[in-house]
Each structure stands twice: as structure tokens, then as C-alpha cells.
From Swiss-Prot:
PANTHER family: TRANSLATION INITIATION FACTOR IF-1, CHLOROPLASTIC. GO terms for molecular function: ribosome binding; rRNA binding; translation initiation factor activity. It comes from the Eukaryota. This is Translation initiation factor IF-1, chloroplastic. GO terms for cellular component: chloroplast; cytosol. Keywords: Chloroplast, Initiation factor, Plastid, Protein biosynthesis, RNA-binding, rRNA-binding. One of the essential components for the initiation of protein synthesis. Stabilizes the binding of IF-2 and IF-3 on the 30S subunit to which N-formylmethionyl-tRNA(fMet) subsequently binds. Helps modulate mRNA selection, yielding the 30S pre-initiation complex (PIC). Upon addition of the 50S ribosomal subunit IF-1, IF-2 and IF-3 are released leaving the mature 70S translation initiation complex. Coiled coil: none annotated.
């Protein structure tokens, strides 16, 4: 049976250390998150201010895993 996950969108507020990030969700919660292995292998750079998708376990909702970095839609270059 596959584990159940919640997927949320949020904004990276800071990156304190060791690949951990603090993500502010749309409902104003602040969750520490780490980068998934596929993003790490693809060398995708995540910086404060980026919008990301994270998945949170239903069993431990105190931390999440960043699974996707959303593109900036406001840049018209």
C-alpha cells in the first residue's frame, strides 16, 4: 500500500543549513523541509523567495519534502 501524502504549495522563507529550508504554506504555517533526491540529483537550485510544492506525511505533519520548484510567472523576459 502506498503511503498517503498531502501536497501543498508554499514560499521558501530561509535556508538555515544542511539542505533544510523553511517553507511558509498558503495557510500561513511554517514547516521545515528538505529537498527530494531527484531535485538534488538534477542540481536544481532552490533559493529563498522561490515557490515550491512540498509533500507532507499524514503521520508526521511537522516537516515536509520539496518535490517541485514552480516557475516564476511574473517575469516577462
Amino acid at each position: 500500500m502506498k503511503r498517503q501524502k498531502w501536497i501543498h504549495e508554499g514560499l521558501i522563507t530561509e535556508s538555515p543549513s544542511n539542505g533544510m529550508f523553511r517553507v511558509r504554506l498558503d495557510n500561513x504555517d511554517l514547516i521545515p523541509s528538505y529537498v527530494s533526491g531527484k531535485i538534488r540529483r538534477s542540481l536544481i537550485r532552490i533559493l529563498p523567495g522561490d515557490k515550491v510544492k512540498i509533500e507532507v506525511s499524514r503521520y508526521d505533519s511537522t516537516r515536509g519534502r520539496i518535490i517541485y520548484r514552480l516557475r516564476n510567472k511574473d517575469s516577462k523576459d
